[in-house]
């Protein structure tokens, strides 16, 4: 792969390979276009070992919205002798209406292709970041085992669980991005805030109230989303009882197909970004979503779940409604499982990573920490993938 990389530059998408990740081996790449049973397009890149190198195991990785066809793990695993399908789901780069249940169909499509079309003897499901909960949901809900092994690499407990951790609970009016309850304001000096880059100090009792209020805000958004879906279903049913073409029928018909969209302000406000005494580990202050002040991520462009359909919110970003929560799915993932956690991760706490390992239903499971490494494992990727490869060698051909 040809790189045109200015000195000291970094990719906006942290999971992209960097020049230092390029293996010496002449690995092969082939674009792949698959069609899911329900007609969705699944695009990816099929990475294979150098020409003439036989392989028997395929690694499959994806993410609900990220394009993992170019994930840093792909070339390193191919150089180690595995075929790799990194792919993007139907929701690539836009999870506004992301239904994890549909993304699972895309995972099934990818696994079927590597087994049936490419002849893989074994399949490894690799879940990185938000891909961990997607792969675990796919494995847990499949009628029979999808993979022969499961790897969680810097995986968080689920996108909805993550939202419970980062949503700003001080919002008092969902229509007003500047509404706030001062008692819950992360940026109020009375609560322990100091301007970046000074460290903040939040009282543990205040943090406990903050966490409870985060759940309450998610519950309020859930209620709005669920109400809109109920109303839509009721109007759809009502339209079927009316004479077609009339004013009442037309109104009910429109309401019966209406898709409610939610604008959700301030979704990146974890006190642990600013106070390293909260769940202490090896992380630095800040978040991968802002450079450098986390306040910019909470109030500024992009962010997470800022505009969502009602059903997309409930399926993906609600920590109270989404089924893609690894604490719920991992007990059903019984294939050999490896959990690799970078202890300098600003987004995933060590207790969470250890909790995933504990929740796993696999009899053969392992937990490995990469001391001091950050979420995207920049500068430590070869080390992390060596851990994965060493663990896979005795378990898959």
Predicted feature locations:
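Short alpha-helix in the alpha/beta-hydrolase fold that links the catalytic acid
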Residues: 165-168, 325, 335, 349-358
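Short beta-strand/loop motif that positions the catalytic acidic residue
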Residues: 333, 339-341, 345
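Alpha/beta-hydrolase-fold enzymes
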Residues: 146-287
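N-terminal cap/lid segment of alpha/beta-hydrolase-fold proteins
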Residues: 2-57, 379-380
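Conserved alpha/beta-hydrolase
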Residues: 74-94
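Acidic catalytic loop of the alpha/beta-hydrolase fold
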Residues: 159, 344-348, 375
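Catalytic nucleophile-loop/oxyanion-hole region of alpha/beta-hydrolase
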Residues: 65, 90-124, 162
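Catalytic histidine-centered segment of alpha/beta-hydrolase-like enzymes
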Residues: 373-385
């Amino acid at each position: 792969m040809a790189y045109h990389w200015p000195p000291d530059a970094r990719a906006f998408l942290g999971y992209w390979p960097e020049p230092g990740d390029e293996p010496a081996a002449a690995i092969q790449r082939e674009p792949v276009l698959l069609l899911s049973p329900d007609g969705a397009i699944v695009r990816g890149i099929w990475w294979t070992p150098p020409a003439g190198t036989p392989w028997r195991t395929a690694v499959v990785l994806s993410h609900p919205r990220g394009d993992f066809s170019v994930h840093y793990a792909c070339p390193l695993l191919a150089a180690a002798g595995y075929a790799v399908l990194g792919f993007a789901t139907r929701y690539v780069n836009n999870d506004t209406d992301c239904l994890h249940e549909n993304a699972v169909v895309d995972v099934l499509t990818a696994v079927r292709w590597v087994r049936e079309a490419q002849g893989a003897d074994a399949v490894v499901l690799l879940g990185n970041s938000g891909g961990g909960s997607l792969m675990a949901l796919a494995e847990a809900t499949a009628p029979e085992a999808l993979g022969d092994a499961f790897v969680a690499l810097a995986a968080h407990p689920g996108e909805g669980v993550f939202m419970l951790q980062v949503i700003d609970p001080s919002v008092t009016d969902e229509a007003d991005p500047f509404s706030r309850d001062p008692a819950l304001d992360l940026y109020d000096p009375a609560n322990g805030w100091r301007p970046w880059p000074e460290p903040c100090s939040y009282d543990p009792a205040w943090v406990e109230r903050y966490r409870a209020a985060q759940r309450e805000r998610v519950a309020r958004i859930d209620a709005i989303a669920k109400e809109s879906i109920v109303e839509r279903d009721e109007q759809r049913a009502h339209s079927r009882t009316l004479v077609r073409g009339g004013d009442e029928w037309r109104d009910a018909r429109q309401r019966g197909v209406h898709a409610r969209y939610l604008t959700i302000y301030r979704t990146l406000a974890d006190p642990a970004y600013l106070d390293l005494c909260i769940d202490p580990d090896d992380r630095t202050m800040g978040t991968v979503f802002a450079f450098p002040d986390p306040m910019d991520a909470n109030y500024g462009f992009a962010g997470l779940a800022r505009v969502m359909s009602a059903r997309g919110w409930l399926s993906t970003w609600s920590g109270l409604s989404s089924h893609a929560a690894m604490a719920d799915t991992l007990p059903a993932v019984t294939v050999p499982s490896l959990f690799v956690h970078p202890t300098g991760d600003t987004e995933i706490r060590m207790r969470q990573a250890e909790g995933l390992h504990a929740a796993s239903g696999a009899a053969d499971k392992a937990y490995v920490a990469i001391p001091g490494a950050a979420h995207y494992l920049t500068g430590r990727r070869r080390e992390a993938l060596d851990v994965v490869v060493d663990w896979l060698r005795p378990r898959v051909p």
